[in-house]
Amino acid sequence: MIRKKNNKVVLAYSGGLDTSAIIPWLKENYNFEVVAFVADIGQSKKDLNGIEKKSLESGASSCHVFDLKEEFIENYVYPVLKTGALYEGSYLLGTAMARPIIAKKQVELALNIGANSLCHGATGKGNDQVRFEMAYAALAPNLNVIAPWREWNLNSRESLLKYLDKKNISTTATLEKIYSKDENSWHISTEGGLLENPWNQSNEDCWSWTVNPEDAPEKPEYVSLQLKEGCVVSVNNQKLNPLKCVEELNSLGAKHGIGRIDIIENRLIGMKSRGCYETPGGTIIMTAIKAIEQLVLDRESFRWREKIGLEMSSIVYDGRWFSPIRKSLQAAADSLSLEITGEVILKLYKGSVTAVQKKSPNSLYSEEYATFGEDKVYKQSDADGFIRLFSLSSKIRAQNMLK
């Protein structure tokens, strides 16, 4: 089926089996000039080595590789950290945060070179198709969107390999069923394989960055983090930019088996999925941020921040990065984060990270008031009137029930 002629499409290209097949498929079925766009957000060097040559051999007219690692951490990861967002209580949103920056740069390239279409390799079962296309709609509503997985009949690994062989395009992929992995500077995820059965216990093939906590060092390691307005600015008294902070803490955390989660999550499209996620640096940073939060936020602010984090986790997960509500919640979180400044010393030991010391110039904690010993600043009798008023509605309700 030959579609429109003389058109140009920008493909979000990873170099994997799917997107390698998409290039010739687009040319065959749409008669398009295919421009490959590669976002370097910290995936393994193995995935990036020779990727330009590979895309051209697959039929792309050109390949554009963008180094987005620093921008990803500074403008996407750190802002979300300020909100305290954890999807369904544990997922630090590593894949979800990466999609908007990829889509944004893909759109910018398309507009710059005069392309009229965008294409992604996300499957029709996953969240990423929604995330990409939500971003496309917000940033370039007039560009066409092509989602091959919702059109073609190449719905198995075997059929994709046969298609590439037919097109004389070489690939290192095999028929062996392997895990699906997604990696960037913030995290790595592993899905598929034995994980598709929730009764199967994950094995070490499911983990890529972190050592098994059982095999981690027998002695704990301590790390000091300095935070300024909700952002980590130094590690062990060494000032580092956001990307370097994350990389340093990834290395430290991985050595101690920190940041592993094996979860079943609710996908946006309705089904449940299981994944093994590793976010060693992010787990350490989030623990430090929460430690300072406890010192500096009053009760109402703390509760408001928890609500922001809960809502933001769904917004980011669902691909609504460029929505007005995301920007509004970010502004609220940024305001609260102005107080989150201080130092935290964390203990790293066999898969756990614990904030063991914390201090802040904005601390609301007063040892004088909190002591269980004798004090001269708090009159315990003052609690009488407070309790009478605070319990008044409960008392009236109980009296009515006795009538």
UniProtKB/Swiss-Prot annotation:
> Could you state one GO cellular component term attached to this entry?
cytoplasm
Task: Name the residues that bind ATP.
Answer: 12-20, 39, 121
Residues that bind L-citrulline: 91, 127, 131, 180, 189, 265, 277
Residue sites binding L-aspartate per the record: 123, 127-128
Query: Its annotated pathway?
Result: Amino-acid biosynthesis; L-arginine biosynthesis; L-arginine from L-ornithine and carbamoyl phosphate: step 2/3
**In the UniProt record, does the keyword Amino-acid biosynthesis occur?**
yes
What Pfam families does the database record attribute to this sequence? Arginosuc_syn_C, Arginosuc_synth
Mind telling me which PROSITE patterns this protein's record contains?
ARGININOSUCCIN_SYN_1, ARGININOSUCCIN_SYN_2
Identify the keywords attached in UniProt to this record, alphabetized. Answer: Amino-acid biosynthesis, Arginine biosynthesis, ATP-binding, Cytoplasm, Ligase, Nucleotide-binding
Q: What is its EC number?
A: 6.3.4.5
| Catalytic reaction(s) noted | L-citrulline + L-aspartate + ATP = 2-(N(omega)-L-arginino)succinate + AMP + diphosphate + H(+)
Q: Which residues cross the membrane?
A: none
> Subunit comment for this entry?
Homotetramer.
Query: Which HAMAP family does this entry report, sorted A to Z?
Result: Arg_succ_synth_type1
User: Which family, according to the similarity comment?
Assistant: Belongs to the argininosuccinate synthase family. Type 1 subfamily.
Record's protein name: Argininosuccinate synthase
